[in-house]
Curated annotation (Swiss-Prot):
Superkingdom per UniProt: Eukaryota
Residue segments, region LID: 170-207
Organism: Phaeosphaeria nodorum (strain SN15 / ATCC MYA-4574 / FGSC 10173) (Glume blotch fungus)
Name by which UniProt lists this protein: Adenylate kinase
SUPFAM superfamilies per UniProt: P-loop containing nucleoside triphosphate hydrolases
InterPro entries given in the database record: Adenyl_kin_sub, Adenylat/UMP-CMP_kin, Adenylat_kinase_CS, Adenylate_kinase_lid-dom, AK2, P-loop_NTPase
Length: 277
């Protein structure tokens, strides 16, 4: 083998340096420090499951921004329809005023109406808070398949209940958007203030240990059959939500089969082959 000349070494170093710069840029995007959406031409159609405090309010806005999709939190959507006195909202209000539960048909039709009329939904949607039962999941699938927009992913953020207790007791929420923060783990830039709007944050009255344990028990009882349903369809994917938000985001990108995620992993490859100090 011919001896390695200085020009060859310099050329190799230059190539590695360029690769490192590119990798740093991509890793910055993965951490949310890069430019705008890198997937303007992509779309996503998914439901995001997880117990209260698992991080849905942190990750859903990032997914929304990346894919230019709409985030449909069904509880907020129902309240908005009632406040706007839409036909579905009036129908739902009658039921709620009588102490009843809004029917699955009304909820699915509200989602359908939102998908048809909300321009943000043109490139996809993140559905949060629905379905809660297998019957709802079946009705949702029927509607989406009829409109040729079947679900691509059913992602479940998984986390130990005891860790959730410590998370939720310090949770802060921006009521208008649903963005969530934590006094210790994910504090806002300014105390009790939403980073994006500057509006005040609140701490929900039901964010206490006793109430939370009841909510978790209900969540697990409701969600297990729904998870089993989506496991059978092949679109269910778990994510370890005990990780820091940046790592959870990388796990989500892997699920979405994002090219940037694959490229970002090449940094560890350079370490392995000895080309990165």
């Amino acid at each position: 083998m011919a001896p390695t000349t200085d020009p060859a070494v310099n050329e190799l170093k230059s190539t590695v340096h360029k690769l490192e710069q590119r990798i740093a840029e991509l890793e910055g995007r993965l951490s949310g420090h890069g430019g705008g959406s890198s997937s303007a031409q992509e779309s996503v159609r998914m439901i995001l499951m997880g117990p209260p405090g698992a991080g849905k309010g942190t990750q859903a806005p990032r997914i929304k921004e990346k894919f230019c999709a709409c985030h449909l939190a069904t509880g907020d959507m129902l309240r908005a329809q009632v406040a706007a006195k839409t036909p579905l909202g009036r129908e739902a209000k009658k039921i709620m005023d009588a102490g009843g539960l809004v029917s699955d048909e009304i909820m699915v039709n509200m989602i359908k109406t939102e998908l048809e009329n909300n321009q943000e939904c043109a490139k996809g949607f993140i559905l949060d808070g629905f379905p809660r039962t297998v019957t709802q999941a079946e009705k949702l699938d029927g509607m989406l398949e009829a409109t040729q927009k079947p679900l691509q992913h059913a992602v479940e953020l998984q986390i130990d209940d005891q860790l959730l207790v410590s998370r939720i007791t310090g949770r802060l929420v921006h009521p208008a958007s649903g963005r969530s923060y934590h006094k210790i783990f994910n504090p806002p830039k300014a105390p009790m203030t939403d980073d994006a709007t500057g509006e005040p944050l609140i701490q929900r009255s039901d964010d206490n240990e006793e109430t939370l344990k009841k909510r978790l028990s209900t969540y697990h009882a409701q969600t297990s059959p729904v998870v089993a349903y989506y496991q059978k369809t092949g679109i269910w994917k778990p994510v370890d939500a005990s990780q820091d938000p940046g790592q959870v985001w990388k796990s989500l990108l892997k699920i979405f089969d994002d090219k940037a995620y694959v490229a970002g992993r090449s940094g560890s490859l350079l370490n392995k082959i000895g080309l990165k100090n």
